[in-house]
Design a protein with these regions (language model features):
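Conserved GNAT acetyl-CoA-binding A-motif
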Residues: 95, 102-115
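Conserved active-site alpha-helix within GNAT-family acetyltransferase domains
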Residues: 117-134, 138-141
Length: 154
């Protein structure tokens, strides 16, 4: 699936993009995974990456919270793909694009995530390494993982 990426700070998203992102996040995080508050104060201190299909329908999004808000490093979170976009590599495209955007904004910085535990292998395939024991967040098992950018040989 080819996606057109939008990368913007919260204040620059525009009401339609913000609505699209929150609607998709609510559909997955609240309706599919059980009720908890999704929008939080970190949204305003984040970049948001949105992937739209050819018809202009949001299929995937994530946010990158600024360093110093949740962790010392920038942190990727609220990673979500629409149900109809799953199983075709959309999630892989989303995370890869998110890591690339992190390196554009914070070159050479590590990236931290609080991953749902069942996705540890998925994130591990990008080079994320577990740095905590499993814990519950919103009644869902999670694990902290850290990605360190590859060293570029000069």
């Amino acid at each position: 699936m080819a996606l057109k990426w939008t990368w913007a700070r919260f204040d620059d998203l525009g009401v339609h993009a913000l609505h699209d992102a929150l609607a998709l996040r609510c559909k997955v995080f609240i309706l599919e995974q059980g009720p908890y508050q999704d929008p939080d104060g970190a949204d305003k201190q984040s970049y948001h990456l949105l992937g739209y299909d050819e018809a202009g329908v949001l299929q995937a999004c994530l946010r990158v919270v600024d360093p110093g808000v949740n962790y010392p490093e920038p942190s990727i979170g609220r990673v979500v793909t629409a149900k109809e976009a799953r199983g075709n590599g959309t999630g892989r495209l989303l995370v890869a694009e998110g890591l690339a955007r992190c390196q554009q904004v914070w070159p050479g910085r590590a990236v931290r995530i609080s991953a749902q535990a069942h996705l540890q292998r998925f994130y591990g395939s990008f080079g994320f390494v577990a740095v905590s024991d499993e814990y519950l967040e919103d009644d869902i098992p999670h694990i902290e993982m850290l990605w360190t950018p590859p060293v570029v040989q000069g």
